[in-house]
Each structure stands twice: as C-alpha cells, then as structure tokens.
Amino acid sequence: MTLRDIARKDFTAARRSRALWAVATLLGLLTALIAFGYSGYRTGPEETVIQLFRAMGGMFGLLLPIVALVASYMAIAGERESGGVKFLLGLPNSRRDVFLGKLASRLGIVTAGLVFIFATATAMAVARNGALPVGVVAGMFAVSLLYTSVFVAIAVALSATVAERSRAIAAAVGSYFVLVLLYVIPGVNVALLARFVHQTLLGFEPNFDLYNAVLFTSPLIAYRKAMNLVVPSGLEREVLQRPAESYTPPGYLGDEMSLLVFAVWLAVPLAIGYWRFEGADL
C-alpha cells in the first residue's frame, strides 16, 4: 500500500462521516439563505454579489475551522486508538506515508465540502442578482481554501500527537478557542491582553504596532486581511486597530503578509506533528 492508497482509503472512509456532512450541509444551506436574502444598498448587481461574499467571509472565518477540525481531528488518533495504525505500518508503509496520506485525504474531504458550500452560495447569488464577479468569487474561494487548510494541518498535527479520542477532541476544541475565539471575544481578546501586559504590568508606552502584530498571529485575522487582496479597491475593510485616522501601519502589517502567516501555520504544526508521530511509541 502506497501513500496514494492510504489517502484513497482514508478519503473513502472519512467522507461517510455524518457529523462532517451535517456541518457542511448546514453551512451550505445557511449561505444559500443569506445569499437569497441579501440586498446591497444602492449598488449594482455585481457589487451586491461582491459585498455578499465579503459579508459571508465574516461567517466563514468562524465556521470553516469547525468544518476542518471535525473532518480531521481523528485522522491519526483514531487509527492509534483502534490499533489500525499497526496494520497500516505493517503493509509496509513508513510513518511519513501514513502522516501525509491522512493529511492528503482530509484536505480532499474539506475541499469537497468547501466546493459544495461555495457552489450553493454562488448559485443562489447569481439567481438572485443575475451577476457573477468570477475573479472575486474565485479569489474568495482560494483564500477560504487556504484558511481551511491551515486548520486541517493543525488538526492532523494534533491528531498525530495523541492516541485517544478524548484527547483529540480536547485538542481540537482547545485549538479553536485559542486561535479563533480568543481573538474575537470582547473584553478578553489577545490584543487587549497584550496591551494589558505591555502597558499595565510592564509599564511601557502604548505601541499599537506591537498589539496589531500580536493580533496578526491568528489565522482568523490573516483570513480577514487576505480577503482584502481579492476584493476591488475601495471595498477593503479595516481589520487591525487604528489609533488615529492618520495612522499608517508598517509593511509587516500589510494585507500581503497574511499569506506568510498562513504559510507559518501550515508548516510549523505539520513539522511538529510529524516529529512527534515519528518518535511515538505505537
């Protein structure tokens, strides 16, 4: 059995997950309803569709990680708990084959789910408005796929480090809280915590570049910044804090840097997860 065989077998098994398709179907129906009911204010059909997808991006930022985590949290932990990993490694396959095969299959599952979600939203938006800004929709899909892939990578990496379902669930829930909710909950988000430590505890002068840099470490914030790269000029949204109207953020806080944030969140968790899996006692 090769890496491709592992990926194909796991894809076939994972796509039967009722929880995964329940989440994807619910999200697809929700986006279709939003697309049907959305109407732009004094805008033409094409700009209305662009604003629609821009608005749905806020919802995707919170819900797409759930799709990715549900699809991937048991990728390797499930095999370890059931003992199936010993069968896979005895065929023979290397641990690298198992790790990459599982990653590829879960990416395939999530991509299929995302295609379904975007297809339903796009079909409803076109039927409602009679316009399709192909470049913007394709760009939003690409950015959303990249964002979702980050959480697939994180989930597979975490799954490779644990051997029990309960721990895999705890790791998935914890990652969602730390990387998503902690950046959006009013009063306790990461930027406020960084500001409190920097100013109140350490006694330094306010440094909004520092607070924004801390905020930019989240895949969610990177996703919101990346959406500015695919919408027409004038429809971008402010994502980071602006202490004053005249504030000009440094280059490392630019929208383009969101791609680097994604790259780091793809590479580092996978490297650590593979390293832990390679040395695990199975």
Residue positions per predicted region:
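Aromatic- and glycine-rich beta-strand/loop motifs that create alpha-glucan
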Residues: 1-27, 275
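Hydrophobic/aromatic residues in alpha-helical transmembrane segments
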Residues: 65-72, 120, 154, 183, ...
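Membrane-embedded or membrane-proximal helical elements that form or frame transporter/channel pores
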Residues: 41-73, 245, 249-252, 256-261
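Transmembrane helix boundary and interhelical loop/hinge segments in multi-pass membrane proteins
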Residues: 48-53, 69-91, 102-103
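Membrane-interface alpha-helices at helix entry/exit sites of multi-pass transporters
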Residues: 94-106
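Hydrophobic alpha-helical transmembrane segments of multi-pass membrane transport/permease proteins
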Residues: 18-40, 57-69, 171-182
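Secretory targeting signals
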Residues: 34-38, 46-64, 105-166, 195
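Terminal transmembrane helical anchor/hairpin motif
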Residues: 37, 41, 181-271
